[in-house]
Amino acid sequence: MNRLEKLLKKMTLREKLAQMVQVLPFVFTDDVDRNSLTGPLKELNVKQEDLYNIGTVYPALNVFDSEIILNLKKQYFEKNPHGIPLLVANDVVHGLRTIFPIPLAISCTWDPKMAELSVRVAAVESYAVGIHVTYAPMADLVRDPRWGRVL
């Protein structure tokens, strides 16, 4: 039995389900009323220990501060019962610190090198602040006439 199989065998169903959840970082702070910000956590029976089984955090705010992200990862890792690291994800559709035109605009240039450069810069900047997963590049193939403009 390999390491992954052993880990999955040790994990409860609740822990496995929590790995598929993504939250904002403030749920890990003690000075925030989680129920007023994230909905009915009590009704859903979400406990404090469940937070340290959650798979992904989406730091919409303070995304440029690698120290905040690193501290959050350390706090999570120390309290995760199985030593599973926290994934950090963010929308990096057209850059992180360096902002490029949206993908639709870059495609209008017919310049593949510009497209490659923009995603390469976004990847380097994301990695530098501790982001593991970027929701980009993306292609919204919208065929609904109610959606006149999309990225």
Residues covered by each model-derived region:
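N-terminal beta-rich core of secreted/periplasmic extracellular enzymes
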Residues: M1-L151
